[in-house]
UniProtKB/Swiss-Prot annotation:
UniProt-annotated binding residues for L-glutamate: R26, Y27, A28, P29, S30, D62, Y178, R196
Listed name of the protein: Glutamyl-Q tRNA(Asp) synthetase
Organism the protein comes from: Parasynechococcus marenigrum (strain WH8102)
Gene Ontology MF terms in the entry: ATP binding; glutamate-tRNA ligase activity; zinc ion binding
GO cellular component, one term: cytosol
Family, per entry: Belongs to the class-I aminoacyl-tRNA synthetase family. GluQ subfamily.
Motif ('HIGH' region): 29-39
Swiss-Prot/TrEMBL keywords: Aminoacyl-tRNA synthetase, ATP-binding, Ligase, Metal-binding, Nucleotide-binding, Zinc
Record-listed E.C. numbers: 6.1.1.-
Amino acid sequence: MPVPDHLLLELERGQRWRADGTYRGRYAPSPTGALHLGNLQTALLSWLQARQAGGVWLLRIDDLDTPRNRPGAVEAIQADLHWLGLDWDGEPILQSCRRGLYASWLSWFRRSGALFPCRCSRRELAGLARYPGTCRDGGAGWGWRDRRLPSWRLRVPSRDPDGSGDVVVRRADGFIAYQLATVIDELALGITDVVRGEDLREALPAQRSVYRALQQQPPRFHHGPLRCDAEGRKLSKREASSGLMALRELGLDAPAVVGLLASGLGYGPPGARLSAIELLEDLTQKGIRAGHS
C-alpha cells in the first residue's frame, strides 16, 4: 500500500536534512524524574560529538508514557542541561505533540496488513529471547476481551538479520510503543547519529526491524558507558542522591560536575574542573573524537 503523501513529506524532509552532510544528533530523555549522573554523562557525550562535528544537537522529550511523567520534570531537564552548559538547537521537541504523526503511521501499517493483535502478557513472554509468534496467525482479535485490549505487533520476517521477532508498536494500554515513536522521529527529524547509553543497545535489533519495514536507512548508533553506584548497579532516577540537586547541595559547581562526567567517559582524571566548552576545546586540540574509541 502506498505511503500517504503527508507521511512521505515527513520522510522526505528528514532525508533532505540527512543528505546535506550536516551532523544531526539529539538527546532524548524521558520526564519521569530528575536526570541522574548517568543520564547527564550520556547528554555530555552526545553534545560533545555534535559540537565537534559542527552539527545540530536537538533536545527531544520522550513523554508519551504519560502515567510515568513527573510534574515539572521537563523544565528541570532543561534547567540541568543549561546549568552544565549543554546548549541545544531550536525549541525542545515533545513527543506528546506528535501523537498524530505516530497514529498515522500505525494506521498505514495496519491497513497494509503489517500488524497483528497480540494478547500475550509480559509475564508469559518473560525470559524469551524473541517473541515466539504465538498470536501471529490470528485469533487474538483487535477489540476488548476480558477488559483488555491487545498490543499491536509489526510482522517481522523470520529471515530478518537482527532476529528481533515481531515488534510491539502499540502497547496494550493504548500508548504508542517506544520502538515505533523513536524510529519515526529519527527519520522525520533527519537524525544522522544517535548517542545513548549502553543499556539501550538491546533495543537496536527491534528498531532496525522497524527501519527495514519502512525501507529506510537507520542513523549511526553510538552507545556510551553507564555510570554505576558503589554496588555496580546502574543508576536510577529513584535515587535522589545521584542527581544534580544532591551534588549542588554538597557545594559542587558546574565545572566540578562536568569534570566528574568527563572522567566517567575517560576524558580526564577524577577531580578535574572545566566547563563543557573547555572540555570540547581540549578534546579537539588533542585530536580525540568524542564517542569514538
